[in-house]
Curated annotation (Swiss-Prot):
Substrate binds at Y226. Monomer. This is Enoyl-[acyl-carrier-protein] reductase [NADH]. The keyword Nucleus does not apply. The record marks E75 as: Plays an important role in discriminating NADH against NADPH. Its EC number is 1.3.1.9. The gene is fabV. GO terms for molecular function: enoyl-[acyl-carrier-protein] reductase (NADH) activity; NAD binding; trans-2-enoyl-CoA reductase (NADH) activity. It comes from the Bacteria. The lineage of its organism: Bacteria, Pseudomonadati, Pseudomonadota, Gammaproteobacteria, Lysobacterales. Pathway: Lipid metabolism; fatty acid biosynthesis. Disulfide bonds: none annotated.
Length: 405
């Protein structure tokens, strides 16, 4: 079929299989350009592997370190008459090109919060991956979590705490500057956000993997977080989501103590703001990202998801000098900070100066909103110059993926 983008709110309701594959190939090429190292992870599990930082982790592990990878995600496959989700096509493309490079690649499509997913992963590690993994990447960003056991469904809330938050934002449907107001989260919403986006599920995964004996000696685990700056703090770090990320930090410290007994460790990696399906849903973030992208590009500091993950692996988790990142690359909470360039004073001072100046009339001139829109469309396979969007494309793309029912 012929597929063009249809954007509604912060979601594009259509996806382009070939565009998604080209995105993945672009990330693979960026990774390969930095060389392949053999002193890093060999067997990698990525939980939340189909888009954003999770996908970039999988690409970096496979094509930057030659690792075998197992990816878990929850995506919708395409059919002959309907396109699937971008994450499905991303994962299909990864699988195709990993196998072409002689690397082991297997995927599980299902609820990554479920015990069934954990059981299937453990079975595959035992039967197909040599019995153990040495890196577990936890990269789930879901608005909903079904609790294992009870089946109770919890939902996260992108809300401030204590009082209504009003700020300048972009109406991304109309490309206009508006004042957005968000009501504060209730106590229940805060608690539920911690349950969905905090560290509980990460710990359940490590519990299950450790209990089954499939974590290698020296195994590491990393989960992703964002702290941001005072511009975004009310809605993020000081909001319900921030409480969940504090819980993630506490979990990391518990898991680190456990894994350290066997020569490994666990960290939260604090990453920079990038255009992902997750960040597009957070009010204020599109405007902030449009500003910070412009400033960081002008200073030669810009990084996308693949550049961030490449730096995380090569300069933090697996340093070439053999030293642990803890030597000089963590903050007081033992977090790996990859938001260091974004938080430079010169970058943030420029952002704060720009923020009050932006209007509907000068939005495209003062910020990189055009770049934001382009990156957003790319998430779904659109906006590429090397794809003919008026050409017919097959939407029923199959690959080596186990479907959990």
């Amino acid at each position: 079929m012929i597929i063009h983008p249809k954007v509604r709110g912060f979601i594009c309701t259509t996806t382009h299989p070939l565009g998604c594959e080209r995105n993945v190939l672009e990330q693979i090429a960026a990774t390969r350009a930095r060389g392949v190292r053999n002193d890093g992870p060999k067997k990698v599990l990525v939980i939340g592997a189909s888009s954003g930082y999770g996908l970039a982790s999988r690409i970096t592990a496979a094509f930057g370190f030659g690792a075998d990878t197992l990816g878990v995600f929850f995506e919708k496959p395409g059919t002959a008459s309907k396109a699937g989700t971008a994450g499905w096509y991303n994962s299909a493309a990864f699988d195709k090109h990993a196998k072409a490079a002689g690397l082991y690649s297997k995927s599980i499509n299902g609820d990554a919060f479920s015990d069934a997913a954990r059981a299937q992963v453990i079975e595959l590690i035992k039967t197909e991956m040599g019995g153990q993994v040495d890196l577990v990447v936890y990269s789930l960003a879901s608005p909903v979590r079904k609790l294992p056991g009870s089946g109770e469904v919890k939902r996260s809330a992108l809300k401030p705490i204590g009082q209504t938050y009003t700020a300048t934002a972009i109406d991304t449907n109309k490309d206009t500057i508006i004042q957005a107001s968000i009501e504060p989260a209730s106590a229940q919403e805060i608690e539920d956000t911690i349950t969905v986006m905090g560290g509980q599920d990460w710990e359940l995964w490590i519990d299950a993997l450790e209990g089954a004996g499939v974590l290698a000696d020296g195994a590491r685990s990393v989960a992703f977080s964002y702290i941001g700056t005072e511009i975004t703090w009310p809605i993020y770090w000081h909001g319900a989501l921030g409480k969940a990320k504090v819980d993630l930090d506490r979990t990391a410290q518990r898991l680190n103590a456990r894994l350290a007994k066997h020569g490994g460790g666990a960290n939260v990696a604090v990453l920079k703001s990038v255009v992902t399906q997750a960040s597009a849903a957070i009010p204020v973030m599109p405007l902030y990202i449009s500003m910070v992208y412009k400033i960081m590009k002008e200073k030669g500091l810009h990084e996308g998801t693949i550049e961030q993950l490449d730096r995380l692996f090569r300069e933090r988790l697996y340093r070439q000098d053999g030293q642990p990142a803890e030597v000089d690359e963590v903050d007081e909470q033992n977090r790996l900070r990859l938001d260091d360039w974004e938080l430079r004073d010169d970058v943030q001072d420029a952002c704060k100066a720009l923020w009050p100046q932006v209007t509907t009339e000068n939005l495209f001139e003062l910020t990189d909103y055009a770049g934001y829109k382009h990156e957003f469309l790319k998430l779904f396979g659109f906006g590429r110059t090397d794809v003919d969007y008026d050409a017919d494309v097959a939407t029923d793309v199959a690959f080596d993926c186990i479907e959990l029912v």
